[in-house]
Amino acid sequence: MKTVSKWFGYIDKPERVPEFMRRAFTMLRSGRPGPVILAVPDPTGTYDETADPYVTVKGWKAAPDPTDVIAAADLLLKAQNPLIYVGEGVIYANASEELKSLAELVNAPVISTLKAKGAFPENHPLFVGVRGDHVSNYLDKSDLVLAVGSSLSPGRFSHGIPNAATKTIIHCNVDELHV
């Protein structure tokens, strides 16, 4: 179950139901979206659900270190040919307007994953596309790649970054497992 879910829990004792429910809802409402699974064994005991009433769980939002943001902004502004690579995390974060403002501010072309289509207006002059030779050409010419909301993993990122060792790559993602 762990391979198909964000989190998996097994309730081994009835008195642990509230603990597992809180953890499951915390995982649902925090970070990268994904399914959670709670396994409940055969009902061998009883549990009084009024003994520990459910309290709504507030999700958390990750935030980068402000000094890292300043350093990344400085690198982005100094780049000669920056490129923004967008993943589905931009959609999950409802950050499309902020992405558009950033791209326009630094005049950086934008490419996206298939799952991020729509995160940046496809009729915008800075939008390059998802795949194809033109995307490869922009990647090749870039001196800085700002990857936002994308894991850059080979299964999701259809283009390798040519000459990656000679480029500055800034990777911004809420899921630390994808950095």
Model-predicted regions and their roles:
Residues 15-19, 29, 88-95:
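Active-site glycine- and acidic-residue-rich loops that bind
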Residues 25-27, 53-54, 96-107, 159-165:
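Short, solvent-exposed amphipathic alpha-helical segments in soluble enzyme
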Residues 64, 71-145:
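Anionic-ligand anchoring segments at beta-strand to alpha-helix junctions in alpha/beta enzyme folds, i.e.
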Residues 1-19, 115-179:
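Glycine-rich, acidic loop regions that bind phosphate or pyrophosphate groups
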Residues 37-39, 107-114, 170-173:
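Short internal beta-strands
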Residues 23, 27-78:
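Conformationally flexible catalytic loops at phosphate/diphosphate-handling active centers
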Residues 47-53, 94-98, 121-126, 156-160:
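Short acidic, glycine/serine/threonine-rich loops at helix termini
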Residues 40-45, 88-90, 176:
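Glycine-rich beta-alpha junction loops
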